[in-house]
Design a protein with these regions (language model features):
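N-terminal cysteine/histidine-rich coordination modules
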Residues: 1-52
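Hydrophobic transmembrane signal anchors and adjacent membrane-proximal interface regions, especially
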Residues: 2-8, 79, 102-106, 161
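Context-gated lysine
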Residues: 5, 19, 40-48, 90, ...
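Mitochondrial intermembrane space
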Residues: 19, 37, 53-58, 65-68, ...
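Generic structural motif
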Residues: 32-34, 84-88, 133
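Surface-exposed beta-strand edges and their flanking turn/coil or helix-capping segments
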Residues: 42-44, 93-96, 136-138
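Amphipathic protein-protein interaction modules
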Residues: 60-124
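Glycine-rich, aromatic-bearing surface loops/beta-hairpins
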Residues: 109-166
């Protein structure tokens, strides 16, 4: 099915994307669970945008986040769509939703997923911040630098020598 989003033209296998979005495994860490429980209600426009691509807002493939003083900063939330990008805009899609200015990037960026095909693209949302709503202790402030080094190392991305020694 051909879907147009701003200047993007996408060939979406809607049936298989919906099936995948409902069935793939999701992370059970505390910060991700905090996102799952409030994302639908907090971001109705984003939820609608994603559903038009066969995606469920509360079932992303990958989330990068860190606990700040009294909220969680979700650096990125990535989803996988079965299909292809036929035509792409050189800019992201901007959306104001849930009191936040969100950036949405559609591309062929790799995120860990359980796809059984090479024909997929990703939808990644940036700039999400959410309060802690789970009835359990707020995560301790983690060492963000160490987390970033771990993340980049995990996905075979270069890390500068100065960062490795910190």
């Amino acid at each position: 099915m051909i879907v147009r989003k701003n200047e993007f033209i996408l060939d979406v296998d809607l049936e298989n994307t919906i099936k995948y979005s409902r069935e793939h495994s999701i992370c059970n860490c505390d910060e991700d669970r905090n996102f799952y429980v409030q994302s639908k209600e907090k971001f109705p426009k984003l939820s609608k945008f994603l559903s038009e691509l066969g995606l469920l807002i509360d079932r992303p493939d990958e989330i990068g986040s860190c606990a700040e003083e009294d909220y969680i900063d979700y650096h990125f939330v990535s989803y996988t769509v079965i299909g292809d990008v036929l035509e792409a805009d050189k800019y992201e899609i901007d959306m104001f939703d849930g009191g936040l200015f969100l950036n949405i990037v559609i591309d062929h960026w790799y995120v860990p997923n359980e796809q059984k095909t090479d024909k997929y693209f990703t939808v990644t949302v940036y700039n999400i911040r959410l309060p802690w709503v789970l009835q359990e202790p707020f995560p301790e402030n983690k060492d963000t630098e160490k987390d970033l080094i771990f993340y980049f190392t995990k996905y075979n991305m270069p890390v500068s020598a100065t960062a490795k020694t910190a």
